[in-house]
Amino acid sequence: MQEFVEFSSNNAFLVSGLFASALAVIFFELRIKTRNISSLSAPLAVQLINSGATVVDIRDADKFSVGHIGSARNILEAELLKNPENVTKKNKQALLICDTGARSAECATRLRKNGIDNIFSLKGGIAAWQEQNLPVVSD
């Protein structure tokens, strides 16, 4: 314990940064949970896709053409928010995908406020999908 106190006093900025980072992670995780957003890990997203969910990639067309999930439709976020009925029919689930999962989670929040309940976001976005070595296709 004495070594920890000595290390902390000698590296106050490092320890402060560590605590600030930990608090930020906790804050953002709680924020996502309180928004009632269902962010799915890549393996759970695969199960959702296999059950027939609509997959919507909200990234721009250039990024979409470089690599996307095979069954994904490319609909920009602004268009999706204007015409949410394009996402899914009643009682059908939809999975939103972006680069990191942040924009798709925010978009899912807005869509839920518009009454679309069966909407999910890919946690970590396409980057998390590729980290799991799951397939992507390019145009």
Locate each region found by the language model.
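Short, surface-exposed ligand- or partner-binding patches at beta-edge/loop junctions that are enriched
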Residues: 97
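Structural scaffold elements adjacent to functional motifs in cytosolic proteins
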Residues: 55-57
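Rhodanese-like catalytic fold shared by cysteine-dependent sulfurtransferases
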Residues: 1-39, 43, 48-51, 61-93, ...
